[in-house]
Design a protein with these regions (language model features):
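Acidic, serine/threonine-rich low-complexity intrinsically disordered linkers/hinges in large eukaryotic
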Residues: 1-120, 129, 239, 252
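Beta-rich interaction modules in large eukaryotic scaffold/regulatory proteins
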Residues: 99-132, 136-354
């Protein structure tokens, strides 16, 4: 059967297309992912668990937890974003030969939203390349930014090693007017013979600043070169994982080898999570996998187990069992155990959270 949320989204996009050219071709069902009966049942379980049901217990005091976002809705949103990025990247001549996008990350904020230059980033993973998309907005009035680039320097997660990423080119944004967004792309070649690698990117925004001549309302001919340091960006293990459904988590988890090359484990305190519900939401995003068996819903305020599953961009299985505990004294403590069919990916995934 087809994924109904994605099918609905694609049909809406098709029938509401502004261009008449869209109707010159029939609707393409091949763009809609097919889901199994197990996946459909998993969705039903999630919806039932996240829908309020009558209870005989007296209502408890305190704020009510926010309803969890359905995994079907999240999958549809991610699918739509991935298709949008794929179309945009394929239309860029310098990137058109890279092939299909294996995965695009969520949007990462590299500045505060109130700063003069607002910058976000998306990591696009290809078979042989990593492309970082920087979306930039200049909020300064009466000023334009010309020849906007980002100096992006990768270092390995382990400082004693080389990242292996080789910068090939940068596609600058020619001109950024006030409150008009623009995009800079930086392309790196992935290291040969290394399917998965982690890296940290330092980022510096560089541009020529020009004031607007009030008499002509045009930028002045000459400006001055300037730069603006923005937040670092990390390439982590979860960037190589796509969420996936499965019918029996325990069977999959126990079927993956548990030696040092296939399993990684870490116990840590989550200082930025005040409840198990917050910790669950944070870890689902950080680990980049699909919650199974309704485990994204916390039914206790003291202990919880989160079961996550996904597949790497090369097709290998990845599963994570997260055990959590909360106490008023120590806050949220989590034990994260990840197993992967492919060597060393589990360690990269855990390292991206620790």
């Amino acid at each position: 059967m087809f994924s109904l949320p994605v099918l609905e989204h694609q049909l809406v996009m098709y029938v509401t297309a502004e261009s008449s050219v869209a109707f010159s071709k029939p609707f393409d069902l091949s763009s809609v992912p097919v889901v199994t009966r197990e996946q459909s049942l998993a969705e039903d379980r999630t919806k039932k668990l996240t829908t309020a049901t009558p209870t005989l217990k007296a209502p408890s005091a305190g704020p009510k937890p926010a309803p969890a976002r359905g995994s079907a809705e999240a999958a549809a949103s991610a699918s739509a974003a991935a298709q949008k990025y794929a179309q945009q990247l394929q239309a860029i001549p310098e990137l058109s030969s890279y092939g299909g996008v294996l995965k695009s990350s969520a949007v990462v904020e590299l500045t505060e939203s109130e700063t003069e230059y607002v910058v976000t980033a998306v990591k696009h993973l290809f078979k042989e390349h990593v492309v970082i998309q920087y979306d930039i907005k200049n909020t300064l009035p009466d000023t334009v930014l010309a020849d906007v680039t980002v100096v992006c320097t990768p270092t390995a997660a382990d400082e004693s090693e080389e990242s292996g990423l080789e910068e090939e080119f940068t596609i600058p944004a020619p001109l950024l007017k006030t409150d008009e967004p623009g995009t800079v792309y930086v392309s790196f070649r992935r290291p040969e013979g290394q399917e998965f690698s982690a890296a940290n990117f330092t980022n510096v925004l560089r541009f020529t600043s020009k004031e607007i001549d009030p008499s002509t309302n045009e930028p002045e001919e000459h400006g001055y070169e300037d730069e603006y340091e923005i937040e670092d960006l990390d390439l982590v293990g979860s960037d190589y994982i796509l969420p996936a459904f499965a019918g029996n988590f325990d069977s999959i988890f126990n079927g993956i080898p548990s030696d040092d090359e296939h399993e990684a484990e870490e116990t840590l305190q989550l200082s930025n999570a005040k409840t198990l519900a917050e910790a669950t939401e944070l870890l689902v995003k950080s680990l980049g996998m699909q919650p199974l068996e309704g485990s994204e819903v916390t039914l206790s305020t003291s202990t919880h187990s989160l079961k996550l599953y996904g597949k790497s961009v090369t097709g290998g299985k990845v599963a994570s069992l997260v055990r959590m505990a909360f106490s008023a004294k120590s806050g949220v403590t989590v034990n994260i155990k990840v197993r992967s069919e492919e060597e060393m990916l589990a360690a990269l995934v855990v390292g991206g959270v620790a």
